[in-house]
């Protein structure tokens, strides 16, 4: 646990540094693309550099996997923790001053769903906030940066059985009829649309408000979804399931049933309260 605490404390330091960089950084694009074909923002690259430099200082870190790196970066061959991360989720929204964040998954020895032992995310908005799921079976912990520059524990996060928020992503013209019917049912039941375009912000709102659904389905142009399994989807699945919520890819009972074949693999994904995920399964099983 001491080594994990070193990682958690490093994530806190990273969050504080990136939060400051965001305020004044150049928001322009580079001339490079990341491993999944997105043109990199200078802020993406800078955030990745900050995270890499911080984790290189820890002897317990075996390797790093980043959205902005083509391949796994080995740090200490004999260490046991692999950190997979999205350095700045929603970075294209910084220029309109929306909240964005960083996502971290901590794997032990090998990158497999069952080897994900902890996860965290930071959110850079009007306030700097952090959520850490320290271990399987424990409620995620919510922190907020205080006036003294240190993170203060606020509360543990637990989702209700049923929520009222509906954060629905992907281009609607590419939705399947099954997904369209499901989303229409949520709106017919009175769910409120809450979608910013930043995964961290939308999932954070559902967690803090107690429940609802975040969806990024398969579409006609992206049948395997767009969100990355290793450093976006599984870390949030770990957090949501430990907050007594549920997750799925629309086929499996949980996102942890996904088989990882490559580090930049994508998947359709759904996160939410148990009632919403149960309803989704009913619709998807009818197709």
UniProtKB/Swiss-Prot annotation:
<feature type="binding site">
    <location>
        <position position="86"/>
    </location>
    <ligand>
        <name>Mg(2+) 2</name>
    </ligand>
</feature>
<feature type="binding site">
    <location>
        <position position="195"/>
    </location>
    <ligand>
        <name>substrate</name>
    </ligand>
</feature>
<feature type="binding site">
    <location>
        <position position="88"/>
    </location>
    <ligand>
        <name>Mg(2+) 1</name>
    </ligand>
</feature>
<feature type="binding site">
    <location>
        <position position="89"/>
    </location>
    <ligand>
        <name>Mg(2+) 2</name>
    </ligand>
</feature>
<dbReference type="InterPro" id="IPR033391">
    <property type="entry name" value="FBPase_N"/>
</dbReference>
<feature type="binding site">
    <location>
        <begin position="89"/>
        <end position="92"/>
    </location>
    <ligand>
        <name>substrate</name>
    </ligand>
</feature>
<dbReference type="InterPro" id="IPR028343">
    <property type="entry name" value="FBPtase"/>
</dbReference>
<protein>
    <recommendedName>
        <fullName>Fructose-1,6-bisphosphatase class 1</fullName>
        <ecNumber>3.1.3.11</ecNumber>
    </recommendedName>
</protein>
<comment type="subunit">
    <text>Homotetramer.</text>
</comment>
<feature type="binding site">
    <location>
        <position position="226"/>
    </location>
    <ligand>
        <name>substrate</name>
    </ligand>
</feature>
<keyword id="KW-0378">Hydrolase</keyword>
<dbReference type="InterPro" id="IPR000146">
    <property type="entry name" value="FBPase_class-1"/>
</dbReference>
<keyword id="KW-0119">Carbohydrate metabolism</keyword>
<dbReference type="GO" id="GO:0006002">
    <property type="term" value="P:fructose 6-phosphate metabolic process"/>
</dbReference>
<dbReference type="InterPro" id="IPR044015">
    <property type="entry name" value="FBPase_C_dom"/>
</dbReference>
<dbReference type="GO" id="GO:0042132">
    <property type="term" value="F:fructose 1,6-bisphosphate 1-phosphatase activity"/>
</dbReference>
<dbReference type="GO" id="GO:0000287">
    <property type="term" value="F:magnesium ion binding"/>
</dbReference>
<feature type="binding site">
    <location>
        <position position="67"/>
    </location>
    <ligand>
        <name>Mg(2+) 1</name>
    </ligand>
</feature>
<dbReference type="GO" id="GO:0005986">
    <property type="term" value="P:sucrose biosynthetic process"/>
</dbReference>
<keyword id="KW-0479">Metal-binding</keyword>
<feature type="binding site">
    <location>
        <position position="232"/>
    </location>
    <ligand>
        <name>Mg(2+) 2</name>
    </ligand>
</feature>
<dbReference type="GO" id="GO:0005829">
    <property type="term" value="C:cytosol"/>
</dbReference>
<keyword id="KW-0963">Cytoplasm</keyword>
<dbReference type="Pfam" id="PF00316">
    <property type="entry name" value="FBPase"/>
</dbReference>
<dbReference type="InterPro" id="IPR023079">
    <property type="entry name" value="SBPase"/>
</dbReference>
<feature type="binding site">
    <location>
        <position position="86"/>
    </location>
    <ligand>
        <name>Mg(2+) 1</name>
    </ligand>
</feature>
<comment type="pathway">
    <text>Carbohydrate biosynthesis; gluconeogenesis.</text>
</comment>
<dbReference type="GO" id="GO:0006094">
    <property type="term" value="P:gluconeogenesis"/>
</dbReference>
<dbReference type="Pfam" id="PF18913">
    <property type="entry name" value="FBPase_C"/>
</dbReference>
<comment type="similarity">
    <text>Belongs to the FBPase class 1 family.</text>
</comment>
<dbReference type="GO" id="GO:0030388">
    <property type="term" value="P:fructose 1,6-bisphosphate metabolic process"/>
</dbReference>
<keyword id="KW-0460">Magnesium</keyword>
<dbReference type="GO" id="GO:0006000">
    <property type="term" value="P:fructose metabolic process"/>
</dbReference>
């Amino acid at each position: 646990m001491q080594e994990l605490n070193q990682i958690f404390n490093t994530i806190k330091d990273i969050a504080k540094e990136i939060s400051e960089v965001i305020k004044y950084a150049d928001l322009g694009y580079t001339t490079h693309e990341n491993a999944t074909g997105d043109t990199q923002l200078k802020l993406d690259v800078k955030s990745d550099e900050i995270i890499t430099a911080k984790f290189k200082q820890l002897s317990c870190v075996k390797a790093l996997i980043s959205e902005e790196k083509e391949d796994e970066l080995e740090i200490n061959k004999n260490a046991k923790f692999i950190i997979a991360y999205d350095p700045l989720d929603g970075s294209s929204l910084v220029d309109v001053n929306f909240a964005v964040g960083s996502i971290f998954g901590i794997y032990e020895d090998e990158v497999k769903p069952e080897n994900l032992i902890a996860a965290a995310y930071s959110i850079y908005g009007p306030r700097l906030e952090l959520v850490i799921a320290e271990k399987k079976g424990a409620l995620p912990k919510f922190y907020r940066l205080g006036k003294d520059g240190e993170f203060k524990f606020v509360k543990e996060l637990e989702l209700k059985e049923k929520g009222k928020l509906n954060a629905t992503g992907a281009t609607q013209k590419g939705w399947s009829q099954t997904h369209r019917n499901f989303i229409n049912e949520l709106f017919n039941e009175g769910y409120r649309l809450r979608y910013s375009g930043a995964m961290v912000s939308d999932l954070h709102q559902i967690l803090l408000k107690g429940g609802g659904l975040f969806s990024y389905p398969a579409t006609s142009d992206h049948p395997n979804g767009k969100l990355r399994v290793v450093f976006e989807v599984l870390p949030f699945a770990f957090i949501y399931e430990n907050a007594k919520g549920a997750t799925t890819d629309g086929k499996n009972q949980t996102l942890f049933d996904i088989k990882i074949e490559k580090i930049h693999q994508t998947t359709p994904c759904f996160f939410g309260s148990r009632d919403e995920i149960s309803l989704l399964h009913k619709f998807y099983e009818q197709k």
